[in-house]
Regions:
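Catalytic cores of nucleotide-sugar-dependent glycosyltransferases that transfer UDP/GDP/TDP-activated
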Residues: 21-201
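Acidic, Ala/Val/Gly-enriched low-complexity intrinsically disordered segments
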Residues: 4-7
């Protein structure tokens, strides 16, 4: 028997109700920035509709019991500075465009969380600045879980940038990135693009 309520919030197998759908929303923040606030509101909308929704974040600003902070503050800071430091060094010690790009070379482990293991659906939102590495995204995709990714910018399909600003290099393989101090055909954006192709394959 299928209970009353939004069918999308229940798992149905062979016509029988099995359980509430468990959704884990992944975001760098819960209440900082438009993407995070949208993800947080979605979690509550899903819960109101009958889903068992929760959220995993790098930086937790709310006291919401359904939001779990992943990693210690010290380790999360280390992931953040490792990524920004790599970009800073690659960009010839220039702070210009430092936050216009992300390389996702460092991040927390989501796949080891009990909330991840229990979830039916993993819903990615904005997951940069030391939240998820490309290696961890690859683990998420290989986990067998159903994955939804809401794109709040273009980073998921460009080499490294969050906003292409008219550049269309991502339609081929990036390279010669206008955000880099020393762009070249096989620069950081090109390598990021190739890494994402491997990650998503």
């Amino acid at each position: 028997m299928i209970p009353e309520g939004p069918a999308s919030c229940f798992i149905i197998q062979n016509g029988y109700f099995c359980s509430k759908m468990r959704v884990l929303i992944i975001s760098t923040y819960d209440l900082q920035g438009g993407a995070a606030i949208a993800a947080y509101r979605l979690m509550h909308a899903l819960r109101k509709a009958g889903c068992d929704a929760s959220m995993a974040v790098r930086t937790r600003l709310s006291d919401d019991p359904k939001v779990v902070q992943v990693g210690s503050e010290a380790m999360n800071r280390l992931h953040f500075y490792r990524e920004r430091g790599s970009i800073f060094l690659h960009n010839r010690l220039s702070r210009e465009n430092l936050f216009d790009v992300s390389i996702a070379n460092s991040g927390v482990s989501i796949t080891s969380l009990p909330e991840f293991k229990a979830a039916d659906v993993i819903h990615l939102h904005w997951i940069n600045q030391g939240m998820l590495s490309l290696t961890e995204i690859e683990r998420i995709l290989a986990s067998g879980k159903k994955v939804v990714w809401t794109l709040h910018d273009v980073w998921a399909f460009t080499g490294i940038c969050h906003h292409a600003a008219g550049c269309r290099h991502y339609e081929q393989a990036c390279g010669n990135c206008p955000y880099l101090a020393a762009p070249s055909p096989r620069d950081l954006s090109y390598r990021g693009f190739l890494k994402k192709q491997i990650t998503y394959a």
